[in-house]
Amino acid sequence: MSAVDEEMVLAHFIVSDDVERSRRFYTEVLGGKAVISGEASQEVTYVALANSWIIINVGGGPTDDKPTVTLETPPDPDRVSSFLNIRVADIQAVYARWSARGAQFLTPPKQHGTEMRCYIRDPDGSLIEVGQTTLPRGWRPPS
């Protein structure tokens, strides 16, 4: 039995030094809903956000299923190899709403080609892009 109703759901795993603080950010600032939350800040939390999940957990050393991998928060938040990208219908409205809730954007939304975008950081320094496609409604990339 699985908690996933579809064949596949894309989730994003976030390593946090303070799971409770991150849970509050992803629920109270970004508007997600905690669907699984541990009793203590050291336990995993799942936040439903848009049509996906954010999995928040503390870092840690290798385990038997990832024997060479150590999970940690970004040592330098300005050097990034991967980040969460949230697509929205109205970036100006999201920018205003999330700013009012305490999100600290790096810049206001800016036009870049066929999208407007801006960036925020979560409490552990992980980068999050917020973007709005400015292509015609219903446009999809070719398959």
PLM regions: where:
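Short, solvent-exposed loop/helix junctions and linker helices
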Residues: 16, 85-88
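Vicinal oxygen chelate
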Residues: 1-11, 33-86, 93-121, 133-143
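Conserved beta-strand-loop-alpha-helix junction that forms the acyl-donor binding cleft
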Residues: 13-19
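Short Gly/charged-rich anion-binding patches and loops
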Residues: 21-22, 93
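Conserved active-site tyrosine of GNAT-family acetyltransferases
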Residues: 22-27, 98, 125
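Short glycine-/small-residue motifs
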Residues: 127-130
